[in-house]
């Protein structure tokens, strides 16, 4: 395939790769029952003036996931003609496909509109070190266009210490860090909102809230009603079925405070897989590929197993712990 691309991408099917054109939003059809994968990995050629931030804004991708999918590429000057992987193929998060699901480990939100067979997915900025985003099951309790911002005392103190004192209230407008719209969550003190900055989406940059591109939060504003459930999880390893095959998508694990975790990754991936009883029976697993996927943490779904009655994959074996 393409020699610069991450090693595990050699296991991606050609059908999962396509040449990309600009998209307005990642609105994708839900897969059939028993299937878990949406979208396709896309490839573009960078223009001279492109940065990962520009490309991410155009394709609803965050900075961290762009970096992970394109190791070795300069995020601020990829270079004209450089092939860029767009990680726009996703394994849906585990659990009910309803309301909003936020997966901290992938800096991404999924929204399942009621009564429609589609899912919307958007990149997020999450809480930075010392200001972790919560793991919770909550709901949208209010929607506010053109919000003002009343900085909490802790944030005012932080800014004052940096020589950047904040007013008691920041009015609505282009300088407001909440952007043009906010959703208030039932978990006290937490919001989903826009931004007054071009950068920071798909990164650990907020004070615990969830920051979106302004066009994305405005699109959500027109779709998401008050009362919508919001499930916040932290799952770096997602397993999914597609066409009778099992796929793994790996991201850098984060601890409960949103910092990169020192967890035993092999144990964590086995535990995540064992939670999916529907996929762990009668499989032939390619453990070499599993190790590659876990090591790469590039956010790309990769085939790791087939039913035991199918043609065996290279280095395959029945389900065993990673040793």
Task: Locate predicted features.
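Short beta-strand-centered segments at strand-helix junctions
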Residues: 206-221
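LysM (lysin motif) carbohydrate-binding repeats in extracellular/periplasmic proteins that recognize
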Residues: 47-76, 118
């Amino acid at each position: 395939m393409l020699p610069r691309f991450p090693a595990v991408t050699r296991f991606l099917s050609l059908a999962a790769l396509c040449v990309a054109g600009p998209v307005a939003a990642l609105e994708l059809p839900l897969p059939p029952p028993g299937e878990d994968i949406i979208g396709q990995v896309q490839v573009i050629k960078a223009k001279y003036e492109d940065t990962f931030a520009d490309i991410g804004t155009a394709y609803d991708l965050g900075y961290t996931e762009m970096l992970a999918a394109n190791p070795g590429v300069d995020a601020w000057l990829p270079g004209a003609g450089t092939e860029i992987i767009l990680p726009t193929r996703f394994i849906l998060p585990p659990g009910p496909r309803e309301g909003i699901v936020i997966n901290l480990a992938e800096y991404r939100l999924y929204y399942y509109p009621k009564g429609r067979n589609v899912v919307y997915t958007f990149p997020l900025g999450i809480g930075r070190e010392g200001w972790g985003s919560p793991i919770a099951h909550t709901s949208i309790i209010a929607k506010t266009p053109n919000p003002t911002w009343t900085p909490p005392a802790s944030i005012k103190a932080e800014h004052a210490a940096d020589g950047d004192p904040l007013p008691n209230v920041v009015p609505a407008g282009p300088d407001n860090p909440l952007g043009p719209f906010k959703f208030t969550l039932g978990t006290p003190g937490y919001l989903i909102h826009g931004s007054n900055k071009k950068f920071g989406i798909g990164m650990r940059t907020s004070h615990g809230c969830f920051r979106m591109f302004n066009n994305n939060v405005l699109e959500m504003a027109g779709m998401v009603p008050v009362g919508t459930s919001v499930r916040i999880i932290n799952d770096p390893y997602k397993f999914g079925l597609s066409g009778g095959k099992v796929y793994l998508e790996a991201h850098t694990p984060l601890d409960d405070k949103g910092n990169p975790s020192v967890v035993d990754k092999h144990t964590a991936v086995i535990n995540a897989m064992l939670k999916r009883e529907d996929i762990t029976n009668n499989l032939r697993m390619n453990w070499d590929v599993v190790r590659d996927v876990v090591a790469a943490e590039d956010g790309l779904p990769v085939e790791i197993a087939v039913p035991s009655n199918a043609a065996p994959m290279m280095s395959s074996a029945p389900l065993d712990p990673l040793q």
